[in-house]
Regions:
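Alpha-helical solenoid repeat scaffolds used for protein-protein interaction
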Residues: 2-302, 329-342, 504-507, 527, ...
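Residue-level detector of buried hydrophobic side-chain packing
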Residues: 150, 254, 265, 330-332, ...
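Short helix/loop capping segments that flank catalytic or ligand/cofactor-binding pockets
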Residues: 158, 264-266, 275-276, 340-343, ...
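Catalytic-core domains of enzymes
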Residues: 162, 226, 234-238, 270-276, ...
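Phosphate-interacting basic helix/loop segments used at nucleotide- and nucleic-acid interfaces
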Residues: 307-324
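Active-site-proximal beta-strand/loop segments in catalytic clefts of secreted hydrolases
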Residues: 333-336, 392-396, 423-424, 443-447, ...
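Catalytic cores of nucleophile-dependent amide-cleaving enzymes
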Residues: 372, 439-528, 532, 600-601
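Caspase-like cysteine protease fold
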Residues: 454-457, 462-476, 524-616
Length: 616
């Protein structure tokens, strides 16, 4: 076959390199490592004919080519030297980044990211072994940075573009890129709708043609923006900045990386990082899934409270939460199946109590907030609240989908002079018209988590809203989105990117903080919790504190029956956002105010010297 291939004369360097890689894989099966390695380097020289160095190629000689990934990954797998193994993986990461620069759809980026996650896990294995041997914190820091680099690449890219647009509001390339991304998501939404309904098949071809044109245009603008803002875009997370943020927030952070064989956990507090490994053994995964499935139906916990508390405590122990500092704000950055865990409902001690208000839930020990990645945690600082609220309450009266207690929930917004769209006025058009004009968006409606073939949806009075329509939102940067709807935090789980949920779609669009549910919550409990939330927010002016206190108030409410105090009812809502308590707000204003004064002082000094020099 090889002789016939070369006789054909109709081949490229890429074809030859791939042939060498395939031949090398045959030697893998016969355990002939030297022959495999020689063929892989032969493939490398074929792709880099001008590279004279016989060792590792220089990064600036590489280009976006999938065959490089096959070569470097294979070399890493057969390499026995740990340091050189990492060097090969780093070259794969570099080429993967070059490839991602040319990708313009979320779907293609997710596929590319999937392979990066596998490489990251291999690197973490090496760092873990080195840490076990040396106990040198250098390996913890390195592992954390690699884990963070693999998290939410698409969301981070969107966040970077938003920041660039704020810093360079008149840049035409950024404006056109933003418009093209919005048009792309709008077309994808139209395509998905047509595929679901089976209507107008001819229009599908037309949309695909438009998408192909946009793809070409986006590649051009992406390249322009990469060249213009390369130094501003490529900034790696600083661990010292992370420690500084944790100190200001007076918090501790629990960070997870979910791999194929292990879950790696980083507990960070007071300039100290502890690294743990949790093996994905059957006992751990079964217990985790059992805990998650307790929230599938309201009756499951109530029917067997003791089994639930036992399962919950075992998970608490398995996640090594027992070493958390008590009575301290805690940020959780979940991953994998942990995205679907209501950590508030973990039980911190063995108990036989069947009275929910007496069960030692984690919510009584620590105030929790969540984030998707450490970069977002650092960037998400408390801002002065605008407190302009718009609410959407379709209610769906006299239908099987009626939300009976949604009216009570709406009353909680009245003291804020909120604009409320009730019943038939809670339309998709009114949402699109108003979503960019208010600092808090409140949606009390139905939501779906989607399926393998269909995306998650948000239900308005007159129509469904699919994920891609939310991705396409422009100038939608609310300080808070409240999703008082079923399953708004659930969606198809993608490695590294998390659940493709309604909540993530709002993050993608630009929401700063989000409060959403993890399962089909009872609308009475939802109304009660939201009432508690806004009553507390009116006093505390803190999303973080209001979310915590709404749950405590619910558990302490003597008018609510014990069965309704099951964590199924009160722990569904999770808050992804800043720790914006009053004390922290003061510290941030003091910190940034101090920086502003220093800048003004420097400008004044420079101006004074300039005037003096002119007088002379």
């Amino acid at each position: 076959a090889k002789i016939a291939f070369f006789k054909s004369k109709n081949f490229s360097a890429r074809d030859v390199a791939k042939l060498y890689v395939e031949e090398a894989s045959i030697y893998r099966f016969t355990n002939n490592i030297n022959s495999e390695k020689n063929l892989l380097y032969q493939a490398l020289r074929t792709l880099l004919p001008l590279e004279k160095n016989s060792g590792l190629p220089k990064k600036n000689s590489l280009y976006p080519e999938n065959t490089f990934l096959m070569i470097f990954d294979a070399l890493a797998e057969i390499e026995t030297n740990a340091e050189r193994k990492i060097d090969y993986y780093d070259l794969s990461f570099y080429v993967s980044d070059l490839i991602k620069d040319n990708l313009v759809s979320q779907e293609s980026l997710i596929i590319q990211q999937f392979e990066d996650r596998k490489r990251t896990e291999q690197c973490l294995k090496i760092f873990w072994l080195n840490y076990q041997k040396t106990k040198n914190n250098f390996w913890i820091d390195k592992a954390f940075l690699y884990a963070e680099r693999s998290k939410n690449v698409i969301l981070k890219e969107q966040s970077n573009l938003k920041t660039l647009a704020e810093l360079h509001p008149n840049n035409k390339d950024l404006q056109l890129q933003k418009q093209l991304i919005s048009e792309q998501e709008t077309l994808i939404n139209q395509l998905i709708r047509l595929q679901i309904t089976g209507e107008n098949p001819n229009e599908i071809e037309n949309i695909n043609s438009k998408l192909a044109t946009i793809t070409i245009e986006l590649k051009i603008y992406n390249e322009k923006i990469q060249k213009q803002f390369k130094t501003e875009i490529e900034k790696e997370l600083s661990i010292s900045d992370l420690y500084a943020k944790i100190k200001i927030d007076k918090t501790q952070l629990v960070y997870f990386f979910w791999g194929n064989q292990s879950v790696y956990q980083f507990q960070i507090s007071d300039n100290k990082m502890v690294w743990n490994q949790i093996n994905l053994e059957a006992k751990f995964t079964e217990n985790l899934k059992k805990f998650i499935h307790f929230f599938d139906d309201a009756s499951l916990i109530n029917n067997n409270i003791q089994l639930f508390t036992k399962t919950s405590f075992e998970l608490f122990e398995a996640l090594q939460f027992s070493i958390l500092e008590k009575s301290k704000n805690t940020i959780i950055i979940p991953d994998g199946l942990l995205n679907f865990v209501a950590f508030d409902a973990l039980v911190t001690q063995k108990t036989t109590s069947k009275k929910y208000s007496e069960i030692p839930f984690l919510v009584h020990q620590n105030k929790l907030a969540y984030q998707t990645n450490a970069t977002f945690y650092i960037k998400n600082t408390p801002k002065e609240k605008q407190n302009t609220i718009v609410g959407f309450f379709p209610i769906f009266e006299n239908t099987n989908a009626e939300l009976l207690y949604s009216k009570e929930e709406a009353k909680a917004l009245l003291p804020f002079k909120a604009l409320l769209f009730m019943n038939e006025k809670a339309t998709k058009a009114n949402f699109l018209k108003n979503s960019s004009q208010y600092s808090i968006l409140h949606l009390s409606t139905h939501g779906t988590s989607g399926s393998f073939s269909e995306p998650a949806t948000l239900v308005f009075y007159d129509d469904l809203m699919l994920l891609n329509e939310l991705y396409a939102l422009q100038n939608c940067h609310p300080q808070l989105v409240v999703l008082s709807a079923c399953e708004t935090g659930i969606g198809k789980l993608q490695k590294g990117e998390g659940a493709m949920s309604i909540a993530r779609a709002f993050q993608y669009a630009g929401a700063e903080n989000i409060l959403f549910s993890l399962w089909k919550i009872n609308d009475y409990a939802s109304a009660q919790l939201m009432t508690n939330f806004y009553e507390d927010y009116a006093k505390s002016n803190s999303f973080f504190e209001a979310n915590y206190n709404s749950k405590i108030a619910y558990l302490e409410n003597s008018d609510i029956a014990n069965a309704k105090k099951s964590p199924y009812y009160w722990s569904a809502f999770v808050y992804y956002g800043a720790v914006d308590s009053a004390e922290n707000n003061y510290l941030y204003y003091l910190f940034f105010g101090g920086i502003a004064i220093i800048i003004l002082f420097l400008i004044y000094g420079r101006t004074s010297r300039l005037f003096k020099s002119k007088k002379i």
